[in-house]
């Protein structure tokens, strides 16, 4: 395994890019919550020009979102170049290049969303790609850290499903839940699929916490993200209930009311944090816990039955 050379400034910069990406997600949520997606009706220009428009009404949300997106694209490109020039791990360099490709696709989806007047499929794809890009940014911040390496001494895990499988599956469920939530926010789905997804994600998170604290209570690399995951999820469930009640109460309002905007935007932001926390939990499971081993298998021959176990010394 190729050893990395830790660069504290690269790691800090990667954290900064991840934080800027989170800010971009919040800005995008404000656009949707304020129904401001078409406040600037063209793309890539704003009202036919690249000059700064008057930042009033929904324009401040939509154009502000574009400005933050442009800044994040520049920051990500710098990070990818820095990784390519200084990180000896080929897979990390490729991950940096993938992050640049992802944000370019995301920008194109954002432009198509405006040019084709907020089609549901593209709008949902735009929201999901934002979560993928944020996950990539968090991974880069994680992998550039001083302590990251996969060849840690690993604890045995003979449970089924293994902690690796449980965390990976829960992370996939969280992403699907965010996808369904985006469909609900953009009026493409009802509330029932989102409720079903919330139940599944909650079950997965509870299973992770129970497994970690029962089998690996002395491993802070597992217990800390597990605890953060369940706390964020409880907050998210409360925000989800609150945002739905507020939306029902304000459904006849001519424009989005501030309490609805605030709660729904925070709901999106916490959802993104739940996703990356679950992702970090999965990465830590692969780092500190083995993948489990198959139990001895019984094989039958034409003659007497022979039990074939694991190979060992005699």
Task: Give each language-model segment a name.
Residues 1-314:
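Polytopic transmembrane helical bundles with strong interfacial aromatic enrichment
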